[in-house]
């Protein structure tokens, strides 16, 4: 069974130590609930990932583990076959011992867009909400973060993350916990909190912003990326049914409306640092994710619209600061 004991040890003397009052019981319950089903099968695959300590690790410019020179052709083919068991791979890309995991998303492009606008992550304790398989967590570590914690309830994402971590080395201070943000107590401890590609999946976006605020220390930085539409501060799209074939999209505000939401949640120093239309080159089907992707979600006669007739995906990134506690928004 996937163990979280090393995470408990790493936070025992940190600003997150009070989390240990509740977290082991929550994750213990998760472990009991996942004794059967797909997780034990995937764990057998993870237990086969015994490979040499990588000769190189680059987390600054990419997520690259091993030069490819340490494994013979047959060993590399065996490793690739093991990693393919965890398909579909959605967020990346990763390079592992000469194997290029070409994921659906070019998550490195998003990172390059937002990185210049972040407060330096060096020596920071960071939370990534809805972290997927953890690509951006490794890039945060590459920027010098002291601790990186990701939360995502997907068992597949957890196993993909564990596969990369076992190949990179378990000593790295980066951990994925199979939790949703609603399972976190108000920790008031993280220096930086990321929420990227999550807000539009939440039935109550203001509550999500308050949950993010409650994880930050006073003066901590929020990095929020979500789908937006054009319009003024009163413009919010609520899809009648599906958006881009997704049935779990609830609210798409304009950038101006989202700024008001952040103010309502008592954030200050709010800045929209990037607005970008998702391109067919950034999100696409690949050999590692052979299912439908963005091109299938757009109107075949007009790529500016989804198949439902809504504006095509456009993403905005906001950076904001947690204000001094001076009013009750709960």
From Swiss-Prot:
Transmembrane parts of this sequence: none
Pfam families, A to Z: Methyltransf_9
Cited function: Catalyzes carboxymethyl transfer from carboxy-S-adenosyl-L-methionine (Cx-SAM) to 5-hydroxyuridine (ho5U) to form 5-carboxymethoxyuridine (cmo5U) at position 34 in tRNAs.
UniProt source species: Shewanella sediminis (strain HAW-EB3)
UniProt keyword Disulfide bond present: no
Record-listed E.C. numbers: 2.5.1.-
Disulfide bonds: none
Protein name: tRNA U34 carboxymethyltransferase
């Amino acid at each position: 069974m996937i163990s979280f004991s090393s995470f408990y040890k790493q936070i025992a003397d940190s600003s997150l130590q009070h989390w240990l009052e509740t977290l082991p019981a929550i994750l213990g319950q998760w472990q009991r609930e996942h004794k059967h089903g797909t997780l034990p099968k995937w764990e057998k695959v993870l237990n086969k990932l015994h490979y040499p300590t990588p000769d190189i690790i680059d987390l600054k410019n990419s997520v690259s583990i091993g030069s490819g020179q340490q494994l013979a052709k047959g060993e590399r083919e065996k490793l690739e076959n093991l990693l393919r068991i965890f398909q579909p791979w959605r967020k990346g890309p990763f390079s592992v011992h000469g194997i290029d995991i070409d994921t659906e998303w070019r998550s490195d492009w998003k990172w390059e867009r937002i990185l210049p606008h972040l407060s330096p992550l060096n020596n920071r304790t960071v939370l990534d909400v809805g972290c997927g398989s953890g690509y951006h967590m490794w890039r945060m570590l590459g920027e010098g973060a002291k601790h990186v914690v990701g939360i995502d309830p997907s068992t597949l994402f957890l196993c993909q993350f564990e596969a990369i971590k076992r190949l990179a080395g378990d000593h790295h201070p980066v951990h994925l916990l199979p939790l949703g943000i609603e399972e976190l107590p108000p920790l008031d401890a993280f220096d930086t909190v990321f929420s990227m590609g999550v807000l539009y999946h939440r039935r109550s976006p203001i509550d999500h912003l308050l949950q993010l605020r409650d994880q930050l220390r006073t003066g901590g930085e929020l990095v929020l990326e979500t789908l937006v539409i054009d319009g003024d501060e009163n413009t919010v799209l609520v899809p009648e049914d599906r958006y881009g074939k997704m049935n779990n999209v609830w609210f798409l505000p304009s950038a101006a409306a989202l700024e008001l939401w952040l103010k309502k949640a008592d954030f200050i120093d709010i800045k929209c640092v990037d607005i970008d239309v998702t391109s067919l080159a950034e999100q696409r089907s690949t050999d590692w994710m052979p299912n439908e992707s963005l091109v299938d979600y757009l109107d075949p006669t007009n790529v500016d619209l989804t198949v439902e007739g809504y504006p095509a995906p456009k993403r905005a990134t906001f950076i904001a600061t947690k204000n001094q506690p001076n009013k009750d928004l709960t």
